């Protein structure tokens, strides 16, 4: 097992050519004294980014509910009895209107999500039109459409997509407790297709799903050992929804969430680390510590797919208090 000091020194090189991080390495980092860990992460953050700048993304569900997957955290699954109602796919005009509003609010990236295992060809053609129109507005484009088949990533790239999101969700050893309908390797296969097509990768996970600290270390290791590392790493704090299997999960202590952000920054120094789901349940002080620990991106807007998010006015107020500026 490497000492925490040795692990910290290794972090100076972003996007390693070979996988170097071990679960023991990352667990040692997560166990550092809290103030020391945040300080180290803040130092690394400043080597690669302006700490006063935050990237703003808006996420919209273009097709809600009716998903055949059984992800234990998700209210859109047909396997769970939740308040989320199925909705048809949005029209291109509806998506463009949402993108215009996001841009007017200050977002620089517009993300589109769809609840299905993966896009059928007919659905993909509709999403290609959405990507083209959103790109024409001058926004960065991102999509999270599930598992991709051969050639689909290339079509999205040709339409103007910048980022493709496909999260690993949790550590490999924990994965079977959360999802049964898709394998971990399925996720890695889609990430490989995305890279091969020349798209930037957005890939992160969820904490607060009854996992151990070592499980969180295992997730970070999987992300940090991707070659190259993801350009964007969303870190979600579980939003518990009535009717999902993870309703009633033990809530993650706020210090553990900040530790997770800090270690994501140390192990992936050149990636954007995004505060994603769960921010509405965090107080401003916790969010401020996350920014200090290296978070430099947020989802911006009052809704994330089907769960709540701080409204634009609240986020503008927080950023003003912290002297943060949008990228």
From Swiss-Prot:
GO BP term, pick one: biotin biosynthetic process
EC number(s) per entry: 2.8.1.6
Keyword field: 2Fe-2S, 4Fe-4S, Biotin biosynthesis, Iron, Iron-sulfur, Metal-binding, S-adenosyl-L-methionine, Transferase
Binding site residues for [4Fe-4S] cluster: 67, 71, 74
Catalytic activity: (4R,5S)-dethiobiotin + (sulfur carrier)-SH + 2 reduced [2Fe-2S]-[ferredoxin] + 2 S-adenosyl-L-methionine = (sulfur carrier)-H + biotin + 2 5'-deoxyadenosine + 2 L-methionine + 2 oxidized [2Fe-2S]-[ferredoxin]
Cofactor note: Binds 1 [4Fe-4S] cluster. The cluster is coordinated with 3 cysteines and an exchangeable S-adenosyl-L-methionine. Binds 1 [2Fe-2S] cluster. The cluster is coordinated with 3 cysteines and 1 arginine.
Domain Radical SAM core: 52-279
Top-level taxon in the UniProt lineage: Bacteria
Pfam families in alphabetical order: BATS, Radical_SAM
InterPro entries: Aldolase_TIM, BATS_dom, Biotin_synth/BioAB, Biotin_synthase, Elp3/MiaA/NifB-like_rSAM, rSAM
Annotated positions binding [2Fe-2S] cluster: 111, 142, 202, 274
Top EC group: transferase
GO molecular function: 2 iron, 2 sulfur cluster binding; 4 iron, 4 sulfur cluster binding; biotin synthase activity; iron ion binding
CC cofactor: [4Fe-4S] cluster; [2Fe-2S] cluster
UniProt pathway annotation: Cofactor biosynthesis; biotin biosynthesis; biotin from 7,8-diaminononanoate: step 2/2
Assembly and binders: Homodimer.
Job of this protein: Catalyzes the conversion of dethiobiotin (DTB) to biotin by the insertion of a sulfur atom into dethiobiotin via a radical-based mechanism.
Membership in a protein family: Belongs to the radical SAM superfamily. Biotin synthase family.
UniProt-recorded name of the protein: Biotin synthase
Biological source species: Chromobacterium violaceum (strain ATCC 12472 / DSM 30191 / JCM 1249 / CCUG 213 / NBRC 12614 / NCIMB 9131 / NCTC 9757 / MK)
